[in-house]
Amino acid sequence: MAGKFHILLLNGPNLNMLGTREPDIYGSLTLDDIVSKLSEEAHQSGVKFSHLQSNAEFELINRIHSAQGNTDFILINPAAFTHTSVALRDALLTVKIPFIEIHLSNVHAREPFRHHSYLSDLAVGVICGLGVDGYSFALQAAVNRLSKFN
């Protein structure tokens, strides 16, 4: 589908295990369920939507680099890379594409090492602790922001 805007969703390590990985924290929906729902919401909003999940940091970085010039907004759940990846931070700084950081769980109510993010201060916004709804809220915010400023 050709849309007015292109929004890219990136999901980091272990999110491919949603539905079976700690469902009391992350819920019972699979990543495919979440991406299908978000894809439909994007279609209804008239935007082009693409997605990549990877457990490999370099694949996420390469996808961020290839987004330059053809992507208007990034939604990213960096998962564990949130707390460790200066490289993801640098990639996002390099391409200068606005992004929203998403977390299913409230990272601030979890272990202390999860409280720090290398991305949050660069993000347009951060959504955490709202489960799967956080993805929909992020998509809606991105569409609203793109419509307002373009």
From Swiss-Prot:
Main EC class the enzyme belongs to: lyase
Subunit structure: Homododecamer.
Family: Belongs to the type-II 3-dehydroquinase family.
GO MF annotations in UniProt: 3-dehydroquinate dehydratase activity
Keywords in alphabetical order: Amino-acid biosynthesis, Aromatic amino acid biosynthesis, Lyase
Matches recorded under InterPro entries: DHquinase_II, DHquinase_II_CS, DHquinase_II_sf
Superkingdom, natural source: Bacteria
Active-site residues annotated for this sequence: Y26, H103
EC number: 4.2.1.10
Pathway assignment: Metabolic intermediate biosynthesis; chorismate biosynthesis; chorismate from D-erythrose 4-phosphate and phosphoenolpyruvate: step 3/7
Xref: PROSITE patterns: DEHYDROQUINASE_II
Any GO BP: chorismate biosynthetic process
Matching Pfam families: DHquinase_II
Function: Catalyzes a trans-dehydration via an enolate intermediate.
Residues that bind substrate: N77, H83, D90, L104, S105, R114
Residues under site feature: Transition state stabilizer: R21
Lineage: Bacteria, Pseudomonadati, Pseudomonadota, Gammaproteobacteria, Enterobacterales
Protein name: 3-dehydroquinate dehydratase
Catalytic activity of the protein: 3-dehydroquinate = 3-dehydroshikimate + H2O
